[in-house]
Amino acid sequence: MGQEQDTPWILSTGHISTQKGEDGQQTPKLEHRNSTRLMGHCQKTMNQVVMPKQIVYWKQWPSLRNPILVSLKTRVLKRWRLFSKHEWTS
């Protein structure tokens, strides 16, 4: 019983029911009162994991030797760092 309280994603029913997503795929459905909040947290975390792939393209900009693009790149990277720091601490 104590283990179920420590890990909110353990299903109290002992089985996993599924739900159909928008794309028609079956996904596990969490049966816990905090499941919506937990899934929201997972989704937010996944979004943060995906973002660094896009930064690769920003790093190529200085090679263009265009001061406007370099300035824009610097501003975007500063905002991204502030945003990601805020997201991880909250």
Swiss-Prot record:
Keywords: Apoptosis, Host cytoplasm, Host membrane, Host mitochondrion, Host mitochondrion inner membrane, Host nucleus, Host-virus interaction, Inhibition of host innate immune response by virus, Inhibition of host MAVS by virus, Inhibition of host RLR pathway by virus, Membrane, Modulation of host cell apoptosis by virus, Viral immunoevasion. Coiled coil: none annotated. InterPro entries: Flu_proapoptotic_PB1-F2 (IPR021045). The record marks 66 as: Low pathogenicity. Its main location: host cell. Residues 14-28 have a biased composition (Polar residues). GO terms for cellular component: host cell cytosol; host cell mitochondrial inner membrane; host cell nucleus; membrane. It comes from the Viruses. GO terms for biological process: symbiont-mediated perturbation of host apoptosis; symbiont-mediated suppression of host cytoplasmic pattern recognition receptor signaling pathway via inhibition of MAVS activity. Residues 65-87 are annotated as: Mitochondrial targeting sequence. Pfam families: PB1-F2. It is found in: Host mitochondrion inner membrane; Host nucleus; Host cytoplasm, Host cytosol. Residues 1-32 are annotated as: Disordered. The record marks 66 as: Important for pathogenicity, S is highly pathogenic whereas N is low pathogenic. Plays an important role in promoting lung pathology in both primary viral infection and secondary bacterial infection. Promotes alteration of mitochondrial morphology, dissipation of mitochondrial membrane potential, and cell death. Alternatively, inhibits the production of interferon in the infected cell at the level of host mitochondrial antiviral signaling MAVS. Its level of expression differs greatly depending on which cell type is infected, in a manner that is independent of the levels of expression of other viral proteins. Monocytic cells are more affected than epithelial cells. Oligomer. Interacts with human SLC25A6/ANT3 and VDAC1. Interacts with host MAVS. Belongs to the influenza viruses PB1-F2 family. Is not encoded in all strains, and seems to be dispensable for replication. This is Protein PB1-F2. The gene is PB1.
